[in-house]
């Protein structure tokens, strides 16, 4: 009986290895998603304070978009039949930018009992999009 249980366990293990983990991605997006340099959201902590008033500063969790986009940047000359060439090149590039964000606010306590509200955008997701000139 012990040999049958061991054989069954070994067979299930072999089947899992052959089939792979069904919860993980198996398409090419998994390879791209696993690149640690890809465009993604990164968290960091920063101190928020008012530049003019004497307020107590607050430590806040912020997010930024950072990383590489898979599309290559390119510039190529434009051909013109005019003597004045206003825009001599056509450029194409992609930048890592916020895709979705939400407005957040925090209150700072200042001298004299005054309270000031600071607002900022908290980035929820990032993506690659064409850069503006």
UniProtKB/Swiss-Prot annotation:
Pfam families: Cys_knot (PF00007). Changing residue 58 to N: In ND and EVR2. Residues 39-132 form the CTCK domain. It comes from the Eukaryota. Expressed in the outer nuclear, inner nuclear and ganglion cell layers of the retina, and in fetal and adult brain. Changing residue 121 to W: In ND and EVR2. It is found in: Secreted. Gene3D superfamilies: Cystine-knot cytokines (2.10.90.10). GO terms for cellular component: cell surface; collagen-containing extracellular matrix; extracellular space. Disulfide bonds join 39-96, 55-110, 65-126, 69-128. Keywords: Deafness, Disease variant, Disulfide bond, Secreted, Sensory transduction, Signal, Vision, Wnt signaling pathway. Residues 1-24 form the signal peptide. Its main location: secreted. GO terms for biological process: action potential; angiogenesis; blood vessel remodeling; canonical Wnt signaling pathway; cellular response to hypoxia; cone retinal bipolar cell differentiation; decidualization; dendritic spine development. One of its GO terms (molecular function) is protein homodimerization activity. The keyword Disulfide bond applies. Changing residue 69 to G: In ND; uncertain significance. Activates the canonical Wnt signaling pathway through FZD4 and LRP5 coreceptor. Plays a central role in retinal vascularization by acting as a ligand for FZD4 that signals via stabilizing beta-catenin (CTNNB1) and activating LEF/TCF-mediated transcriptional programs. Acts in concert with TSPAN12 to activate FZD4 independently of the Wnt-dependent activation of FZD4, suggesting the existence of a Wnt-independent signaling that also promote accumulation the beta-catenin (CTNNB1). May be involved in a pathway that regulates neural cell differentiation and proliferation. It is linked to Norrie disease: Recessive disorder characterized by very early childhood blindness due to degenerative and proliferative changes of the neuroretina. Approximately 50% of patients show some form of progressive mental disorder, often with psychotic features, and about one-third of patients develop sensorineural deafness in the second decade. In addition, some patients have more complex phenotypes, including growth failure and seizure. Vitreoretinopathy, exudative 2: A disorder of the retinal vasculature characterized by an abrupt cessation of growth of peripheral capillaries, leading to an avascular peripheral retina. This may lead to compensatory retinal neovascularization, which is thought to be induced by hypoxia from the initial avascular insult. New vessels are prone to leakage and rupture causing exudates and bleeding, followed by scarring, retinal detachment and blindness. Clinical features can be highly variable, even within the same family. Homodimer; disulfide-linked. Component of a complex, at least composed of TSPAN12, FZD4, LRP5/6 and norrin (NDP). Binds FZD4 with high affinity. Interacts with LRP6 (via Beta-propellers 1 and 2). This is Norrin. It comes from Homo sapiens (Human). The gene is NDP.
